[in-house]
Amino acid sequence: MDQPHRRTRKWHLMDLSVSTLLMSLALVLPSCVSAYQPVYFRSQEATPFIPPQVPSADPQSLSGTHEFTLRHIVQRGAYEYPELHRRLDIKPNTQLRTVSEDGIEDNEPAVFNVPFVASSEPVTIERLADRRLSVIEEHLAAARSAGSAVTLSSSQWTKDTLAGPNVTDKKTILTFAKMTANDYIEVPGTEDWQDINGKLNYSTSFGWQNDGLRGHIYADDTNSTIVISLKGTSPALFDGAGTTTNDKVNDNLYFSCCCGQGGSYLWREVCDCQKSAFNANLTCIIEAMNDENRYYRASLDLYSNVTELYPNANVWLTGHSLGGAMASLLGLTFGLPVVTFEAVPEALPAARLGLPTPPGYNPALPQARKFTGAYHFGHTADPVYMGTCNGVSSVCTWGGYAMESACHTGQMCVYDTVADKGWRVAIGTHRIKAVISDVIEVYDDLPQCAPEEECYDCELWKFFRSNGSEITTTSSTTTTSTITTSTRTTTCKTPGWWGCLDDSTTTDPPTTTTTTSSTCKTPGWFGCKDPTSTTATTTTEAPTTTTTCKDPGWFGCRDPTSPTTSTAPQTSTCETPGFFWGCYDTQTAVDHLITPAPILIDL
């Protein structure tokens, strides 16, 4: 009887222990569930503005569907306002207007809260393992110092397979095209821009929204994937040859062989790096491209600040025309998926900026790289996309644009509208809204994407590198001049056919050697514009030789001079002159001065 009771008591104690454990878990689990808090990035003390609340996102699969909505508009100054960096957070009560490609504002409020649907698929990208901005800046600084991209070991690179835009899905491509077409500004009087850097107040400045690079930031429902759509702030592609815009300056700086020099007089020159015809200082060009007020530097800063808001999100990039080229350069720098539309060929600036390049590739030919994750959509009737908008009669030239680059990195997805639709090459087909309505929506299928093969930029040019930041060229020239002098007697006693045959004194010419060393700080089209010359002249006198001609001939002196015989002058008088010439007098003989021989008489 006692044994069953003892066993029952033991099991009762065990049940009590299990119950106690379950009660403890029940008390802990609610606290774990309620521990979810919105994550704040960057402290209030570190920045002058209140950061937005960005909740943590769950990991998602590489393939799926995303619904993106506009979350922020970021303005990064470049030319006139290099310190400007402002952000507009989109709220339910935000009022926006649409800006057309011609720069005309729509008076009606824009509808921007409609979600953009896109799908993702796995994409493999070869990129740096350490992609922190500070590390990237070190690589770029080393490239500027060395004159080319630094060589990194294979251990510093990795091939990652991540979620990227589905470039085989027409709806996804349309979504990205519409994102690049959107350009919004706040309704006047409702502005709510925040200064990110907290240094300057541009609320009373005029025109700051027309300076620099603008990014529209879209995020999906979980904030796990964001899309940065980059665009230049000059809405109209061509605003006349007499108007200077930031886009024109950056276009000619990044996509010209030498900053708009060496071509049409209509091109706007944005640096002075040309030495002579088809010869330029590459160091000078690279320094101009890396100025802090240029679009590439602005894109790095813009990307860095956006990723601080979404540190764990997957970032996709897109853009149209110049914005597409900047998105591609940014994607090559950080190893991000990129989808562009009618982008300017960007392999030339990618090589000059010294972007990190994986082992086995030539840094001077980034168009040969594989696994970049970049896809460039465009059609054959667009001269900007095809790299042919640089002829004498092209609209680009007449607009002041020197767009000489022809090669894209990554893969090109080309609609052959010239062959399929009979289109003529024209700049009007470059507009993104025309591309959406007349190309992407009209074609049933997307084009096949393939890398560009055997493409080279600026083949006629020769580039050299200079030491240091100052543009200096030094040349040394040696000039030899000969001066011939001759001394003649004052009276010519023996005239000849081609001059006097009298005694003459001839002096061998002295030889003068002049060495000129010039330093040129500003090379011009056909030479140096500000030479400072130092001339050293050395003159060597030759010995003087005197010769006497005694027996002159037709072409010079033949032998020593023989004694001369002087004759007395003959005298004649004419008493009966002729009518026209001659004398009718009887000739008067003149005795010879030489004594005649004696007459011999025979005895």
Curated annotation (Swiss-Prot):
Chain segments annotated as transmembrane: 21-41
Gene Ontology biological process: multivesicular body membrane disassembly; neutral lipid catabolic process; pexophagy; phosphatidylserine catabolic process; piecemeal microautophagy of the nucleus; vacuolar protein processing
Reactions it catalyzes: a triacylglycerol + H2O = a diacylglycerol + a fatty acid + H(+)
InterPro entries in UniProt: AB_hydrolase_fold (IPR029058), ATG15_Lipase (IPR050805), Fungal_lipase-type (IPR002921)
Glycosylation sites per record: 166, 201, 223, 281, 305, 467
Keyword entries, A-Z: Autophagy, Endosome, Glycoprotein, Hydrolase, Lipid degradation, Lipid metabolism, Membrane, Signal-anchor, Transmembrane, Transmembrane helix
Active site per database record: 321
Cytoplasmic side: 1-20
Signal peptide segment: none
UniProt xrefs under SUPFAM superfamilies: alpha/beta-Hydrolases
Main location group: membrane
Job description of the protein: Lipase which is essential for lysis of subvacuolar cytoplasm to vacuole targeted bodies and intravacuolar autophagic bodies. Involved in the lysis of intravacuolar multivesicular body (MVB) vesicles. The intravacuolar membrane disintegration by atg15 is critical to life span extension.
Family: Belongs to the AB hydrolase superfamily. Lipase family.
Annotated protein name in UniProt: Putative lipase atg15
Organism: Emericella nidulans (strain FGSC A4 / ATCC 38163 / CBS 112.46 / NRRL 194 / M139) (Aspergillus nidulans)
Gene that this polypeptide is encoded by: atg15
